[in-house]
Curated annotation (Swiss-Prot):
This is Envelope glycoprotein gp160. It comes from Human immunodeficiency virus type 1 group M subtype F1 (isolate VI850). Residues 375-395 are annotated as: V4. Glycans are attached at residues 87, 129, 132, 135, 146, 150, 177-178, 188, 225, 232, 253, 267, 280, 286, 292, 322, 329, 345, 352, 382, 388, 419, 425, 437, 587, 592, 601, 613. The chain crosses the membrane at residues 661-681. A motif (Di-leucine internalization motif) lies at residues 831-832. Residues 550-568 are annotated as: Immunosuppression. SUPFAM superfamilies: gp120 core, Virus ectodomain. The record marks 487-488 as: Cleavage. Residues 488-508 are annotated as: Fusion peptide.
Length: 832
């Protein structure tokens, strides 16, 4: 009984074990995931690259040389494309934007290049004898000085006395202030270069464009403050037209905010940080220099002419700018309200004039038709707001200007003949906040001087990204490859240098072909960069502008990006494919998300961020897999002639077989002749004379055959003899016959043995298949019985449980029904 019980328990355990094993096999039989390469996925990352310019240069002055050199830019696209990215949130930071740094460098380079061919005014650093040239009541006394000086002519030992008009701001007295001897203001601190007489300073809109392989992201949030996430993002190839206006305190001729005034600052609570105010409505400012000046040229030497103011004709009036008081006061009130929202509610906002510093910072400086104006803005920021008429800003004009792009450099601008008028739009303000302990009042003052803030006010909504068209993701598709066991050794050679493998043998060097291809491309890229640097260093000799250099760089960058992507696709065996399967299994440690979760719920940007830490590992595995595949294909091609047995029956192969057979037979016959001759020679040397080849040799008879002939004739006791073959052909035929018989017997034995082995193997294989079939049927029946038993057991348990539940419910029902009876019985008992 105990044995039977144990046997039954073991049977149940065996059934459950088989069931568990089947479930495990089904789970393991799930499809594996493999790495698949995709080309052209919408993925990007932040990058810094060389931007080039586009401009409508032909729409502006053609004769005058414009300092912005926009004639070297590419034409603007008449139909610019802007693609809006849905459900994309991107971070922007206008204070750490490489586009600002690049534009700043470009404008500096343009100014420097425009001044290179112009005249150095070092010979003018001489003593000037000056007198007051203005007597008009509207002009400050001494604003212009009539100066005479001695100048060396072409003949060095002769001097010529000349005279010219200078602004008082451009000269300083030598010695005491009452002296009539002056010098140019920058002679002891910096070199002075005269701007070319035909330079046009009017700003021309410049569009910055990204080269192929890169894109510019644009933030379209109307209240975007310049930093943080932006939810309304689009991609463009070029920015809008940006006028490179060099000004301080007031931003001129820029773009306007679309929805209310916007305050932008890197840290508004830090009073050392500049505050950029972006207006939503422009304020017009009209500036004029009414003097009707004339210009004269002073010959300094061969090919050198100094242009100065010759005379002032007519009424001399001060240069000035006019602004509508009502419009300006309304704008200032809106700015106050916007600034107040960034501080506690009880804080009062107050404006005041500049606190001091260089003339370029304390005044609103800008260029108007070639003349540099310096206007006093204290009337704009006096915080009274009582002037609703026209606000007039008094302005000064300087011809010797401190260059904003570097310290210790100055520029002399040639005087412009006639009246000068320019109309501009104020689109922004540059402010700074006072420090101090006053918690209820915040004072803001105009400032400027850092031209990066001017460019930043226009480039705040842009950023450059690099497009990453290569992406990898798991799929169920696997590349069909030539399978071969992968060797672990030899991968260390992947880290050898490009030229370091030149002395390796071909088998070892073939492993590093991938590395060599990559290093070859990087060498080309490095060489192109070196060439561009050499061109940039010699651009003054090649007469190339900064835009020409940038166009060269953009073209090279586009080729480099394309070659880089195509190189990777070629290394992975995916050339010319948009979707390329591999035989690299997907590792769940890279991402344990299911395929449906990846493809249905994630964007390519989210997916790339998730696997970005493993991208290099995946790329390396794909590369190693492709290298192994190419080695396998090479070894397979070496055995290509054995791939098809039908080639053996080709007529050309048969002729080759016959040729080999004839050579073998001829060799055997030749060897037989050689050995026969050697045997005869050996016997002759021993003194033996060979008998005729007709000699009969005895042939013994068998015991079952009588001697003599069958008729009983012939001599008894005599042995039979056989004839030796005679002649060369008979000898060759005898050898060939013996060779064929020998080959036939051994080939027959080999075929019989092989047939016996094959028959035995097939018989055993058939028996094994029958055994497996019986085993499969047995276990199928066992699984079926186990399932039936499990179903029956479950049914019994469910039935018993149901019966018990019904019984409990019946008892509860009877108890409820018997309640009135019990009450009645209790009442009767109580009455008795």
């Amino acid at each position: 009984m105990r044995v039977r019980g144990m046997q039954r328990n073991w049977q149940h355990l065996g059934k459950w074990g088989l069931l568990f094993l089947g479930i495990l096999i089904i789970c393991n039989a799930a499809d594996n995931l493999w790495v698949t390469v995709y080309y052209g996925v919408p993925v990007w990352k932040e990058a810094t690259t060389t931007l080039f310019c586009a401009s409508d240069a032909k729409a502006y002055e053609r004769e005058a040389h414009n300092v912005w050199a926009t004639h070297a830019c590419v034409p603007t696209d008449p139909n610019p494309q802007e693609v809006f990215l849905k459900n994309v949130t991107e971070n922007f930071d206008m204070w750490k934007n490489n586009m600002v740094e690049q534009m700043h460098t470009d404008i500096i380079s343009l100014w420097d290049q425009s001044l290179k061919p112009c005249v150095k005014l070092t010979p003018l650093c001489v003593t000037l004898n000056c007198t007051n040239a203005t007597n008009n009541s509207q002009e400050k006394p001494g604003a212009m000085q009539n100066c005479s000086f001695n100048m060396t002519t072409e003949v060095r030992d002769k001097k010529l006395k000349l005279s010219a008009l200078f602004y008082r701001l451009d000269i300083v007295p030598i010695g005491n202030n009452n002296s009539s001897e002056y010098r140019l203001i920058n002679c002891n601190t910096s070199t002075i270069t005269q701007a070319c007489p035909k330079v046009s300073w009017d700003p021309i809109p410049i569009h910055y464009c990204a080269p192929a392989g890169y894109a510019i992201l644009k933030c379209n949030d109307k209240r975007f403050n310049g930093t943080g996430p932006c939810k309304n993002v689009s991609t463009v190839q070029c920015t809008h037209g940006i006028k490179p206006v060099v000004s301080t305190q007031l931003l001129l001729n820029g773009s306007l905010a679309e929805e209310g005034i916007v305050i932008r600052s890197q840290n508004i609570s830090n009073n050392a940080k500049t505050i950029i105010v972006h207006l939503n409505e422009s304020v017009q400012i009209n500036c004029t220099r009414p003097n009707n000046n004339t210009r004269k040229g002073i010959h300094l030497g061969p090919g050198q002419t100094f242009y100065a103011t010759g005379a002032i004709i007519g009424d001399i009036r001060k240069a000035h700018c006019n602004i509508s008081g009502t419009q300006w006061n309304n704008t200032l009130e809106y700015v106050k309200a916007e600034l107040k929202s960034h501080f506690p509610n009880n804080t009062a906002i107050k404006f005041n004039q500049s606190s001091g510093g260089d003339l370029e910072i304390t005044m609103h400086s800008f260029n108007c038709r070639g003349e540099f104006f310096y206007c006093d803005t204290s009337g704009l920021f006096n915080d009274t707001g009582s002037n609703n008429g026209t606000i007039t800003l008094p302005c000064r004009i300087k011809q010797i200007v401190n260059m904003w792009q570097g310290v210790g450099r100055a520029m002399y601008t040639s005087p412009i003949a006639g009246n000068i008028t320019c109309n501009s739009n104020i689109t922004g303000l540059l402010l700074t906040r006072d420090g101090g302990n006053e918690s209820n009042i915040e004072t803001f003052r105009p400032e400027g001087g850092n031209m990066k803030d001017n460019w930043r006010s226009e480039l705040y909504k842009y950023k450059v990204v690099e497009i990453e068209p290569l992406g990898v993701a798991p799929t169920k598709a696997k590349r069909q490859v030539v399978q071969r066991e992968k060797r672990a050794a030899g991968l260390g050679a992947l880290f050898l240098g490009f030229l370091g493998d030149s002395r390796e043998h071909m088998g070892a060097a073939s492993i590093t072909l991938t590395v060599q291809a990559r290093q070859l491309l990087s060498g080309i890229v490095q060489q192109q960069n070196n060439l561009l640097r050499a061109i940039e260093a010699q651009q003054h000799l090649l007469q190339l502008t900064v835009w020409g250099i940038k166009q060269l760089q953009a073209r090279v960058l586009a080729v480099e990006r394309y070659l880089k992507d195509q190189q990777l696709l070629g290394i992975w065996g995916c050339s010319g494919k948009l979707i390329c399967t591999t035989n690299v299994p997907w590792n769940s440690s890279w991402s344990n998300k299911s395929q449906e979760e990846i493809w249905n719920n994630m964007t390519w940007m989210e997916w790339e961020k998730e696997i970005s830490n493993y991208s290099n590992i995946i790329y390396k595995l794909i590369e190693e897999s492709q290298n192994q595949q190419e080695k396998n294909e090479q070894e397979l091609l070496a055995l290509d002639k054995w791939a098809s047995l039908w080639n053996w029956f080709d007529i050309s192969n048969w002729l080759w077989y016959i040729k080999i057979f004839i050579m073998i037979v001829g060799g055997l016959i030749g060897l037989r002749i050689v050995f026969a001759v050697l045997s005869i020679v050996n016997r002759v040397r021993k003194g033996y004379s060979p008998l005729s080849l007709q000699t009969l040799i005895p042939s013994p008879r068998g015991p079952d055959r009588p001697e003599g002939i069958e008729e009983g004739g012939g001599e008894q006791g005599k042995d039979r003899s056989v004839r030796l073959v005679t002649g060369f052909l008979a000898l060759a035929w005898d050898d060939l016959r013996n060779l064929c018989l020998f080959s036939y017997r051994h080939l027959r034995d080999f075929i019989l043995i092989a047939a016996r082995i094959v028959d035995r193997g097939l018989r055993r294989g058939w028996e094994a298949l029958k055994y497996l079939g019986n085993l499969t049927r047995y276990w199928s029946q066992e699984l079926k019985n186990s399932a039936i038993s499990l179903f029956n057991t479950t049914a019994i348990v469910v039935a018993e449980g149901t019966d018990r539940i019904i019984e409990v419910l019946q008892r509860a029902g009877r108890a409820v029904l018997n309640i009135p009876r019990r009450i009645r019985q209790g009442a009767e008992r109580a009455l008795l």
